[in-house]
Amino acid sequence: MTKPSILVMAGGTGGHIFPGLAVAEYLRICGWNVSWLGNQKGMEYRLVQSCNFPFEAVEFGGLRGKGLKAKLMLPINLARACFQSWKIMRRLKPSVVLGMGGYITFPGGLITKLLKRPLVLHESNSVAGSANLALAKIAMRTLTGFPDTMEKAEWVGNPIRQEFDNMPAPSTRYEQRQGPLSILVVGGSLGAAALNENIPAALALIPKEVRPKVIHQAGDKHLAELQARYAECDVEADIRPFI
């Protein structure tokens, strides 16, 4: 008997990728063949590879923050991405295609409809992204992580990776804990400007002798800026681009 197969499309940020990985891991346990469509230059490539899912690369990205040249090249880049997606889907013949968000899902979603494959979307954010908003018009089914995110969508919540279910209770995890309090600052995989600006200043108000240890996810683009901000506030922190 042939196993059912799914092609997961997601990229750009952890908010799209991690819920997609949760679905992919669960379906793999259930016996599905799972493949992933994404951009080899995006963070999804590293994350998906680490989970041992076959990765199908398509070259396509967003226009946010790009100049006039990128906008003029959009039709050519979209046509190329659609052709790449078409070749992938003709080869894999997935039973269903799941779009989790990010610009990379747009060309794949168009080709899914063209090849008359079932297209299911999931929007994990409270504000829907451009790709999912556009593809919702042609999707067989649209799901959301939050209520009232998209019209005519079904609110189902966000997929959670299995390792969170397997974690011991906090009372068990921290039973033997010693030393100063530690805090983790996470503003999403791309960082968050408001947190990057205000957290160092807030921590500076706490006396050094009782100040907690800080691990702060800055986002790749804001790493140097955040390091300078902590130095300006005379606060020691473990600053990382992505955790």
What are these regions (language model features)?
Residues 42, 47, 51, 169, ...:
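Donor-nucleotide binding loops and adjacent catalytic segments primarily
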Residues 3-11, 28-77, 220-222:
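Conserved nucleotide-sugar phosphate-binding/catalytic loop shared by glycosyltransferases and other
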Residues 16-27:
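Short amphipathic alpha-helix
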